[in-house]
A protein has these predicted regions:
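Beta-propeller folds
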Residues: 1-210
Length: 210
């Protein structure tokens, strides 16, 4: 998510706030300094201007990204210092209570690599589910199939699989309508004389997807 975001009603704003002194300097940070979290997630009631800190700065309590699900809950990812679990998706109430893991990033059972869920879309007309993508193969950013994730049951439903492509093309992303339905996708040339020069767009019919 962005560094600040209004809730659906506009009554609350969530912000990532630095806990460090704002100093303008250029230096080479050590790895430990780069990994140390210096930001916390704060939700402020704009009607009363009362802030509430939702996260800390340690690996076990730090929030890395966030998006509003509704006026009561946010979807968050946690600090990457927690390992694979830093890529899992969680919900948390706007008052900082009831942190719940929705879906876990995990090792593939039969091959190397990890399976990582990414948020694709939150639709107010579908309050009980969100659209996510999950990588089908070991490379995290390739072959990311689309799923609905039920916020109550935590179960996923496959919507669309990345289709087979010519050897020189690589899948770039889905084209979705306002209901989260995939209508097309884009690719780019990764090999051959048009490498990096050609982007293609395809129509997609989820009814015929196998």
């Amino acid at each position: 998510g962005s560094s600040y975001q209004l809730s659906p009603s506009g009554n609350f704003i969530a912000t990532m706030v630095s806990t460090k002194e704002n100093v303008c300097e250029i230096k080479d940070d050590t790895m430990q300094e780069e990994m140390a979290s210096g930001r916390v997630l704060v939700v402020t009631d704009l009607r009363t201007m009362e802030p509430k800190v939702l996260s800390g700065t340690t690996a076990g309590s730090s929030v890395a990204s966030f998006s509003w699900l509704n006026d009561e809950q946010l979807l968050v990812t946690t600090d990457a210092r927690r390992g694979y679990d830093g890529y899992s998706l969680y919900t948390i109430n706007k008052d900082g209570s009831n942190t719940t893991r929705l879906i876990q990033a995990k090792d593939f059972k039969s091959k190397a690599g990890i399976q990582v869920p990414f948020l694709v879309g939150i639709y107010q007309k579908f309050p009980n589910k969100i659209l996510i993508s999950i990588n089908r193969q070991s490379v995290v950013y390739k072959n990311r199939d689309l799923y609905w994730l039920d916020l109550t049951t935590k179960k996923t439903s496959l919507i669309a699989r990345v289709p087979s492509l010519p050897a020189n093309e690589t899948f770039a992303g889905w084209e979705l309508d306002w209901n989260g339905v995939p209508k097309g996708f884009s690719t780019y040339d990764e090999k051959g004389p048009d490498m990096g020069l050609v982007n293609s767009f395809y129509l997609f019919d989820s009814k015929n997807d196998s």
